[in-house]
Amino acid sequence: MSTAEAVFPAYLVRGDDATVTSDAVKALVAELVGDADPSLVVEEVAQEDDTLAAAVDAAQTPPFFADRRVVVARGVGRFTTQEAAPLVAYLADPLPTTTLVLVGGGGQLPRALVEAVRRVGHVVEAGVPTGRARSAWMATRLKDAPVRLDAQAAALLGAHLGDEVGRLGSLLDLSLIHI
């Protein structure tokens, strides 16, 4: 992130499309890591854990070989309000050298968790818009794409994707293979 932008202690990324949400998490983590070595800064908490204790433990661990830590916990939507309580308690007084990236995925996010993140951080809505906003969303993604499409090709691609616009990144990656 640029020095002008604040780095929050916590981010919650949520969205209905798994691919779009994953892309948003990847972009956010890259922004948070900046020029640092991701292997020294980023810790992915195993999604198989049945509790959020591993995420809380990782978030409470100070950085060792870097100035900051970025802890990513995916699938936090599968936990109940009671199960999320330790994470909510951590967010009341987060470690200043850690940024916690929580990824919704699966289930309803506990309201207390969403509110705790809002108090100290930022909620990222990673959904795909509808109508005209969807066209603008696609145009933005195509502008940053590794291939250039004219307006007619972009319209055909949009029609082909329909409601599954989360596949856009994969299709653009495949197009590079065939060039």
For every predicted segment, state its role.
Residues M1-I177:
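Conserved beta/loop motifs at nucleotide-recognition and modification sites
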